[in-house]
Design a protein with these regions (language model features):
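Bacterial Sec-dependent signal peptides at the C-terminal "C-region" and cleavage site
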Residues: 24-34
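A general, composition-driven signal for non-globular sequence regions
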Residues: 5, 19-20, 61
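Bacterial N-terminal signal peptides that target proteins for export
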Residues: 2-15
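Bacterial N-terminal signal peptides
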Residues: 13-25
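Extended, charged catalytic domains and RNA/DNA-binding interfaces, predominantly
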Residues: 32-419
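Generic low-complexity segments that are intrinsically disordered, proline-rich and/or Lys/Arg-biased
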Residues: 3, 26-27, 39, 378
Length: 419
């Protein structure tokens, strides 16, 4: 504690110091105000310090489905799906619709957006078969398909298998039947009718269904535009090319020629047998910088989860992750022609693909797998249903009913690899 004498002495010392400073002031006080006091003009104008000031950031989480099939997809329409794109958009808006099995369906919560993504290959074939379309019947293979699907039973299964075979080989046995142009034009106009900016986004897309050797490298293309632009093109099919680099060229040409926007995403790497996120291109050459730049430009997201299995990781890759076994589908490739091997897994799943991308970036300077993630249904019912207590299945045959999980969607080439 300071004594009264010490406090008095301290005050005297501070007073003396202040007086000493004041004695120095005359030489300064004689200067003009402009020389001693900074003026606003002395400092150049500058932007605000915070680079994020006055910026608006998204503050709403929107939910939707970016991968849904209707009766326009051959593997849906030929296996019992009758719901149309119009039905799909109505259901997504929260309306009650009648399902393919005749049951009422309504979502728990309406979606904010929906992308209908029917297969580009033979789009609308099922509709043409049901209508006995003259254009289809004038084609020898088209007539054969119509006869076999009309007969039903094993003949219908054989006809369906032939379509799957065309998807595996890229063999277009129908040729140019003008099927796609009218059907696609009607579809994109349907999306425009249901689109309500700020309330519900009815978007168009298609699935490019390449699976060379039965290995799934499917991509879903999603357009940001209306029919005025999407109506200028037709979907790009595996019958045009099985090489994803050609799909990217199609997308580039679309944007250049229409001024529109399009992106794509790969799904079900778990059924690719190591080809989804490989270090090798489709042509067998190593991934290079040009490939990496094109891939991340046109495929900025990956579909990480859907009905045909979860694509985040695998117990073999993440042995300490207790959730790595979630919804696995890892027996073989898509058509059940080749079994899975452990060395394939790191090139199939999203988490390990991020690591592969970093390895490639260290060598190439570009990361082809620096993507974001989305999850979709890939339902082939026209119904974007995923809730456990409101689930209407993958196909029309798996809609609610006592036998919904019986039978096969597709017969595996190798019976041991049941699909």
């Amino acid at each position: 504690m300071l004594s009264l004498d010490r406090i008095t002495s301290l005050r005297s010392l501070l007073a003396g110091a202040a007086l000493s400073v004041l004695c120095l002031q005359p030489s300064i006080s004689g200067a003009s105000p402009d020389e001693t006091n900074p003026q606003p003009s002395d400092f150049p104008a500058r932007k605000v310090y915070s680079p994020h000031a006055n910026q608006n950031f998204p503050d709403r989480v929107l939910f939707g489905d970016m991968h849904l099939h209707t009766n326009l997809s051959p593997d849906a329409g030929l296996l019992g799906t009758s719901l149309t794109a119009e039905d799909a958009y109505r259901a997504a808006r929260g309306r009650t619709v009648t399902s393919n099995s005749g049951q009422p369906f309504q979502l728990v919560r309406p979606l904010d957006f929906l992308v209908v993504t029917d297969h580009a290959e033979y789009i609308g074939l099922a509709v043409m078969i049901r209508e006995a379309n003259p254009i289809l019947l004038s084609n020898p293979h088209g007539k054969w398909l119509w006869e076999n699907f009309t007969a039903g039973g094993e003949r219908a299964m054989a006809a369906f298998a032939s379509i799957v075979s065309d998807g595996t080989t890229g063999n277009d046995r129908l040729g140019d039947t003008d099927m796609g142009s009218t059907i696609w034009g009607d579809f994109v106009k349907t999306a425009d009718r249901f689109n309500e900016p700020g309330v519900f986004s009815a978007m168009t897309g298609f699935e490019w269904t390449s699976m060379p050797g039965g290995n799934n490298i499917h991509r879903v293309a999603v357009f940001a535009d209306g029919a005025d632009k999407t109506g200028q093109v037709l979907p790009f099919s595996l019958l045009d090319s099985q090489n994803p680099e050609d799909l990217w060229k199609y997308m580039e040409n679309y944007e250049r020629n229409t001024g529109g926007r399009v992106l794509s995403h790969l799904h079900n790497g778990n059924l690719s047998n190591g080809t989804a996120f490989s270090k090798t291109r489709f042509n067998g050459k190593p991934v290079d910088a040009a490939y990496a730049e094109a891939r991340i430009r046109w495929e900025p997201i990956m579909e990480i989860s859907q009905i045909k299995g979860d694509g985040e990781t695998h117990p073999f890759l993440s042995p300490d992750d207790e959730f790595a076994d979630f919804e696995r589908w890892d027996v073989g490739n898509l058509d059940g022609s080749a079994p899975k091997k452990d060395e394939m897994l790191q090139y199939e799943y999203g988490r390990s693909a991020l690591k592969v991308g970093l390895e490639l970036e260290a060598r190439l300077g570009v990361n082809p797998y620096q993507f974001g993630f989305n999850a979709s249904s890939d339902a082939h019912t026209g119904l974007a249903s995923t809730a456990e207590d409101n689930y209407f299945g993958k196909m029309a045959s798996s809609e609610p009913g006592p036998n919904r999980f019986d039978g096969e969607v597709l017969r595996a080439v190798d019976p041991a690899l049941r699909i």
